[in-house]
Amino acid sequence: MSKTKTRRWLKRTVGWAILLILVMATWVYVGRYGSTPAFVDANGRVIAGSVATMERLRLGGVEQSVVIRGRNGNAPIMIWLHGGPGQDETGLWRHYNSVLEDYFVVVYWVQRGTGRSYSDDIPVNTMRISQFVADLDQLIGVLKSRFGKRQVTIVGHSWGTSFGVAYTQAHPENLAAYVGVGQVVNAAEGEKRSYQFTLDEARRIRNAEAIQELERIGPPPYGMDKILRQRAWLNAFGGAWQRPTTMRELLWTSFKASEMTIYDGIKYMPGQNFSLNALAAENAKVDWLNAATRFQMPVFILAGRFDRNTDANLQHEYFEKIEAPSKQFRWFEKSAHSPPFEEPEAFNAYLIKEVLPVVMARQQNGG
């Protein structure tokens, strides 16, 4: 190859390499951080007073991801407390429940140890309910200051209700309302009922494989590995999702949201494994049935009729014991453990028609 051809080849190679680096850098940046769309009018102009941000907040010494969205920045604040632990539900909420952003300022918080809020540097001894309560309190402080509110509403799902109730007891003055979805009540009793349902169902339909594995696992208490095996059969029998749903389906739906990226995918399993194992022992001891029945704010318990993850009947038993300024219980007849995603239209309508007026009344009275 002549010197001239060599120089041309080098220039082309270097040029392509630089272009590839730029493309990769752009992809990594977008892939890591994602974006959340602005609220715009019919002419494409950003609606005055709306809010649509993605940010990182240092809560309890750990950087955590928060998406804040609302068509009206003066609307009541609602914070989602996702399940798991370690399960970022931002994409699912954005897909199924984004209409709530027209009525609330909705805060999608990715808790410490979950997804993009996961880091190898998080001390395992900070993965405690008390720390999640402290993180939430710090987040609420930021939101109250930024939006000029005295109170917010928290909506917990599954694990989110474990520390959600703990927060209601520690800082009732900050809450306009508490909403528990798939409420954790008494973890030990819930696990016992969940296991028995799964074994009974396996025997009813004569599923030999399920019977054999469940009998080998035996009744709780047991470790996380056995919980996950029991949950797999629970899902197959409609006790986790009324229509059995695969993790692939959930992830596919979740990652349609612009806020969710390849970075979230990379962080998903490490964060979930870390969170589940770190919190398993303490979460197994949760007993709000005996430890938290008095609330100083309105309480809403929303249960899927077929929920055998956090037993639906146990949720209703808990509701019956609750003392609060006002309380409501709602059955979702076509759901198991996740009414927001299994019956989104009914779930959204309930929050708008039943929860919002209560919250607005408290806000008008100084909340």
Regions found by a protein language model. Give the residues of each.
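Short beta-strand element of the alpha/beta-hydrolase
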Residues: 75-84
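The serine-hydrolase catalytic nucleophile loop
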Residues: 88-97
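Glycine-rich "HGGG/HGxG" loop immediately N-terminal to the catalytic nucleophile
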Residues: 90-91, 113-127
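Conserved alpha/beta-hydrolase
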Residues: 101-119
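Alpha/beta-hydrolase
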Residues: 205-290, 294-297
